[in-house]
Regions:
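Electropositive, beta-rich accessory/interaction domains or terminal extensions
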Residues: 1-97, 107, 142
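Glycine-rich active-site loops that engage anionic ligands at enzyme catalytic sites
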Residues: 83-139
Length: 143
Protein backbone atom coordinates (compact mmCIF):
# COMPACT_ATOMS: atom_id res chain seq x y z
CA UNK A 1 0.00 0.00 0.00
CA UNK A 2 1.46 3.34 -1.08
CA UNK A 3 0.02 6.84 -0.63
CA UNK A 4 0.38 8.65 -3.97
CA UNK A 5 -1.74 11.79 -3.52
CA UNK A 6 -3.11 13.95 -0.71
CA UNK A 7 -5.98 16.15 -1.86
CA UNK A 8 -7.81 18.86 0.11
CA UNK A 9 -9.53 22.15 -0.43
CA UNK A 10 -12.50 24.36 0.13
CA UNK A 11 -16.09 23.46 -0.69
CA UNK A 12 -17.29 24.21 -4.22
CA UNK A 13 -13.77 25.08 -5.39
CA UNK A 14 -11.13 23.05 -7.24
CA UNK A 15 -9.17 20.87 -4.84
CA UNK A 16 -5.38 20.95 -4.52
CA UNK A 17 -2.59 18.40 -4.17
CA UNK A 18 -0.49 18.58 -1.00
CA UNK A 19 2.84 16.96 -0.20
CA UNK A 20 1.90 16.46 3.46
CA UNK A 21 -0.99 17.20 5.77
CA UNK A 22 -2.09 16.76 9.37
CA UNK A 23 -4.85 14.20 9.97
CA UNK A 24 -6.82 15.11 13.10
CA UNK A 25 -8.86 12.61 15.10
CA UNK A 26 -12.56 13.41 14.91
CA UNK A 27 -12.09 16.07 12.20
CA UNK A 28 -10.21 14.83 9.12
CA UNK A 29 -7.46 16.53 7.13
CA UNK A 30 -6.53 19.96 8.45
CA UNK A 31 -7.70 22.62 6.00
CA UNK A 32 -10.11 20.34 4.13
CA UNK A 33 -13.74 21.31 3.57
CA UNK A 34 -14.99 18.53 5.86
CA UNK A 35 -12.47 19.40 8.57
CA UNK A 36 -13.86 22.94 8.42
CA UNK A 37 -17.46 21.62 8.27
CA UNK A 38 -18.15 23.45 5.01
CA UNK A 39 -18.35 20.42 2.70
CA UNK A 40 -21.36 19.86 0.47
CA UNK A 41 -22.51 16.99 2.69
CA UNK A 42 -21.95 18.71 6.07
CA UNK A 43 -25.62 18.71 6.94
CA UNK A 44 -26.90 18.01 10.48
CA UNK A 45 -29.02 15.07 9.33
CA UNK A 46 -26.00 13.27 7.85
CA UNK A 47 -23.56 11.21 9.91
CA UNK A 48 -20.45 13.40 10.00
CA UNK A 49 -18.23 10.64 11.37
CA UNK A 50 -18.15 9.12 7.88
CA UNK A 51 -16.98 12.39 6.32
CA UNK A 52 -13.53 12.67 7.94
CA UNK A 53 -11.43 11.06 5.20
CA UNK A 54 -12.20 9.72 1.74
CA UNK A 55 -9.90 7.22 0.04
CA UNK A 56 -9.66 6.32 -3.63
CA UNK A 57 -7.71 3.29 -4.81
CA UNK A 58 -5.15 4.52 -7.37
CA UNK A 59 -6.34 2.04 -9.96
CA UNK A 60 -9.91 3.42 -9.90
CA UNK A 61 -9.03 6.55 -11.89
CA UNK A 62 -7.97 4.67 -15.01
CA UNK A 63 -11.05 2.45 -14.88
CA UNK A 64 -13.27 5.51 -14.43
CA UNK A 65 -11.63 7.29 -17.37
CA UNK A 66 -11.98 4.15 -19.52
CA UNK A 67 -15.68 3.88 -18.69
CA UNK A 68 -16.31 7.54 -19.51
CA UNK A 69 -13.76 7.93 -22.31
CA UNK A 70 -12.39 10.91 -20.40
CA UNK A 71 -9.14 12.15 -18.87
CA UNK A 72 -10.09 13.20 -15.35
CA UNK A 73 -7.40 13.87 -12.73
CA UNK A 74 -7.35 12.46 -9.20
CA UNK A 75 -8.20 15.81 -7.61
CA UNK A 76 -11.33 16.10 -9.75
CA UNK A 77 -12.76 12.98 -8.10
CA UNK A 78 -12.68 14.87 -4.76
CA UNK A 79 -11.29 12.07 -2.60
CA UNK A 80 -8.69 12.98 0.04
CA UNK A 81 -6.18 10.17 -0.24
CA UNK A 82 -5.17 8.18 -3.31
CA UNK A 83 -3.55 4.88 -2.43
CA UNK A 84 -1.84 2.44 -4.79
CA UNK A 85 -2.36 -1.28 -4.11
CA UNK A 86 -5.16 -0.53 -1.64
CA UNK A 87 -6.66 -3.85 -0.47
CA UNK A 88 -10.01 -3.26 1.21
CA UNK A 89 -10.46 -6.92 2.14
CA UNK A 90 -7.19 -6.91 4.10
CA UNK A 91 -8.06 -3.63 5.85
CA UNK A 92 -11.73 -4.25 6.56
CA UNK A 93 -12.39 -3.87 10.32
CA UNK A 94 -8.71 -3.10 10.95
CA UNK A 95 -6.71 0.01 11.71
CA UNK A 96 -3.93 1.01 9.32
CA UNK A 97 -1.19 3.61 9.36
CA UNK A 98 -0.20 6.25 6.84
CA UNK A 99 2.67 8.42 8.01
CA UNK A 100 2.14 8.80 11.75
CA UNK A 101 -1.68 8.86 11.52
CA UNK A 102 -3.89 5.82 12.06
CA UNK A 103 -7.14 5.29 10.15
CA UNK A 104 -10.04 2.85 10.00
CA UNK A 105 -12.43 2.30 7.08
CA UNK A 106 -16.07 2.89 8.06
CA UNK A 107 -17.93 2.46 4.76
CA UNK A 108 -17.76 2.67 0.99
CA UNK A 109 -17.88 6.03 -0.81
CA UNK A 110 -20.27 5.58 -3.70
CA UNK A 111 -20.36 8.25 -6.41
CA UNK A 112 -22.86 11.07 -6.05
CA UNK A 113 -24.89 13.20 -8.41
CA UNK A 114 -23.15 16.32 -7.08
CA UNK A 115 -19.87 15.08 -8.59
CA UNK A 116 -21.63 14.37 -11.90
CA UNK A 117 -23.03 17.90 -11.94
CA UNK A 118 -19.68 19.43 -11.02
CA UNK A 119 -17.75 17.57 -13.72
CA UNK A 120 -20.52 17.32 -16.33
CA UNK A 121 -19.77 13.60 -16.54
CA UNK A 122 -21.83 10.53 -15.60
CA UNK A 123 -19.88 9.79 -12.44
CA UNK A 124 -22.54 7.32 -11.31
CA UNK A 125 -21.37 5.18 -14.24
CA UNK A 126 -17.70 6.15 -14.01
CA UNK A 127 -17.26 5.28 -10.33
CA UNK A 128 -19.92 2.59 -9.89
CA UNK A 129 -18.49 0.06 -7.39
CA UNK A 130 -15.06 1.76 -7.49
CA UNK A 131 -15.82 5.10 -5.80
CA UNK A 132 -13.56 4.42 -2.85
CA UNK A 133 -14.00 4.35 0.90
CA UNK A 134 -14.62 6.58 3.88
CA UNK A 135 -12.41 6.39 6.94
CA UNK A 136 -12.05 7.95 10.37
CA UNK A 137 -8.85 9.19 11.95
CA UNK A 138 -8.21 6.89 14.94
CA UNK A 139 -4.99 8.65 15.93
CA UNK A 140 -3.91 12.10 14.78
CA UNK A 141 -0.65 12.37 12.88
CA UNK A 142 1.21 13.72 9.88
CA UNK A 143 0.77 12.14 6.46
Amino acid sequence: MELTHIITGEAKKPLQYLSSCEAVKGKGLKGDRYYNKTGTFNKPQLDQSVREISILPYESLQECNDRLDSSLEFKELRRNLVIKNFDYEKLKNKEFQIGTAIFKIVRTAPPCRYLSKLLDEDMMKGLKYIGGYRAVVVQSGLI
